[in-house]
From Swiss-Prot:
PANTHER family: NA(+)/H(+) ANTIPORTER SUBUNIT E1, NA(+)_H(+) ANTIPORTER SUBUNIT E1. GO terms for cellular component: plasma membrane. This is Probable K(+)/H(+) antiporter subunit E. It comes from the Bacteria. Keywords: Antiport, Cell membrane, Hydrogen ion transport, Ion transport, Membrane, Potassium, Potassium transport, Transmembrane, Transmembrane helix, Transport. It is found in: Cell membrane. GO terms for molecular function: antiporter activity; monoatomic cation transmembrane transporter activity.
Amino acid sequence: MRTWFPYPLLSIALLLMWLLLSQSVTPGSIVLGLVVSTVLAWVTLNLQPARSRLHRWSRIAGFILRVVGDVIRSNIAVTLIILRAGRRPVNAGFMTVSLDLDDENALALLACVVTATPGTAWLEYDRRQKILLFHVLDIENEDLWRKTITRYAADLKEIFE
């Protein structure tokens, strides 16, 4: 049974998601969902994510609170930008920042945080030069954005490395 469903919980979760998204529980939808979820579970067999150890558990709560606070502030800022769209020009642009992170999971988490923050998007990371390229909806204060990203990176470095 393990060879048919290498990750049973993943297969079940994908099947349930399929049924929710298709808004149908017909036999055909269930069979198609089973096929898709099983194939995707087989595909994930080849993925071998890097394992990381968390070194400073005490920093995790502070990091989460900081990110939540920044996401709330960004939501408000983006809302104001949208509401004032005709009165004030939007100053969007690209920025680069040097990162001192080596752990792949820390980089992945940083990418999730940057992309989940309204008004920002992670675009590219150069591993050799350790430079992040990201987009900001309102690039009014470049130093603030650089400090925010480097602060996240420093927190993640303490947690993961």
